[in-house]
């Protein structure tokens, strides 16, 4: 960045996307400050790295900064944003700052409605194993390094590209991956056609020497391929895909498959993450790694070393033969994939506690949510996590639970108070069960409490 920018302030610095950029900037030597509503493990980490953290938003927090960075969750009436605008301090979206970091490197941007965090984490791991030493900014904690960001010395920056508000169009990646396109964020987009058009724009921002990596198994991506003007490779289980998986096997946490490229056998890939959707994420990663000339043997070794991502089928504990898992899945497609992974990897009763995320998403995808839980043997719903949204009349977790029950789901319970979910689980779980907490809000706390209480009963 131009030398006159020295102090950068993040409004909502504790968010997983904001904190990653802040950490990279701290490691680059910039003075970084930020505010959030509460102290967390993330804010404490940034403070330990030299960041100045304010708890609560106040006008005086931005008195001596050069630029203010905001996420899509921060509104114009935020006192720090108001103060910055009055002082004529630039206020920029998170994606613009990420684009600035990407401008200094060759960017690898992973986009898609689902699978971004896992795929970004896989790519970061394999590139590091291949000696490329990338800078990484991920929307989840990479278990192998204990954080979601890292400043590397190599030429590449690997980052998640957030499509939720169209701001990923500010990025200009050298390699763009699109894992899938699905109906989501319909509070911002008019319809699926507008979402597809935005992804076409994103893909075509790749330079003439770059590459797009596209999942052919996704129908919406297949629809837009004729509109892609840049060099691309496809991947999937389809026989028409450039990178293809065969002989897929799932046993517990272990997934393995045989990889092929344009009819040529590459070899077997094995990694510790369940689910057919993660086979696709792995194929995307192979496509990126081979574009960067990483030998396939090193790709194989990287996958064997891959330790997964926080809140993506993350085991919180196993007590009395009851496995407690947490997963970020909050869209019907993600929920189906996660539950299918659990059923495919284990022959165990599946107890699911789901916290819907955002009123707008629950409204727009209500009927899809109704049919997303058929793999759950027992389903518990708790109140919607608002994520800053105001309630929408008639859109509640209770009404969703009732509708799910009417559609044939046999064991569905609505519990308004999230804190009461744990006590309910304690009364119904038994040895052999898998308990999954699902949602992008704070439902993960239920799983952690459950593990502690199960330990206390020993």
Swiss-Prot record:
It comes from the Bacteria. It is found in: Cytoplasm. The keyword Transmembrane helix does not apply. Its EC number is 6.3.2.8. ATP binds at residues 112-118. Keywords: ATP-binding, Cell cycle, Cell division, Cell shape, Cell wall biogenesis/degradation, Cytoplasm, Ligase, Nucleotide-binding, Peptidoglycan synthesis. It holds the Pfam family Mur_ligase_M. InterPro entries: Mur-like_cat_sf, Mur_ligase_C, Mur_ligase_C_dom_sf, Mur_ligase_cen, Mur_ligase_N, MurCDEF_pg_biosynth, UDP-N-AcMur_Ala_ligase_MurC. Pathway: Cell wall biogenesis; peptidoglycan biosynthesis. One of its GO terms (cellular component) is cytoplasm. It catalyses: UDP-N-acetyl-alpha-D-muramate + L-alanine + ATP = UDP-N-acetyl-alpha-D-muramoyl-L-alanine + ADP + phosphate + H(+). It is an enzyme of class 6 (ligase). GO terms for biological process: cell division; cell wall organization; peptidoglycan biosynthetic process; regulation of cell shape. Its main location: cytoplasm. The keyword ATP-binding applies. GO terms for molecular function: ATP binding; UDP-N-acetylmuramate-L-alanine ligase activity. Belongs to the MurCDEF family. PANTHER family: UDP-N-ACETYLMURAMATE--L-ALANINE LIGASE, UDP-N-ACETYLMURAMATE--L-ALANINE LIGASE-RELATED. Cell wall formation. This is UDP-N-acetylmuramate--L-alanine ligase. It comes from Geotalea uraniireducens (strain Rf4) (Geobacter uraniireducens).
